[in-house]
């Protein structure tokens, strides 16, 4: 009976350790960035710094280059461009996240005509636009957790 009790307590402690919950609009170093959406346990974080500027075709290598992330983000290799909907969430939280410049940021979303959706982070220009993938715009990576 004592053995069963110890096993049950161990399972309870283990479950509580692994049931970390996360909130939107908060930085979590262990996730590598700032939470932009979550269901409490799973979600998406955005990197804490831009990865640079590039044409769309060069962004995949850029987002997974550890040297282009802060120390927390460099621990992960599953970074990607945000979808246009995720990029809109990043825009809404840009003041809290910080480090953005007034420029255009790439998304991973394509339109039906071969252009890529992007978002202007400067001024009031927060409406999505679509551009040729050969243009050079800024990159801010996201990753799922």
Regions found by a protein language model. Name each.
Residues 2-4, 117:
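Long alpha-helical, hydrophobic tracts
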Residues 19-79, 107, 114-122, 133, ...:
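Extracellular adhesion/carbohydrate-recognition regions
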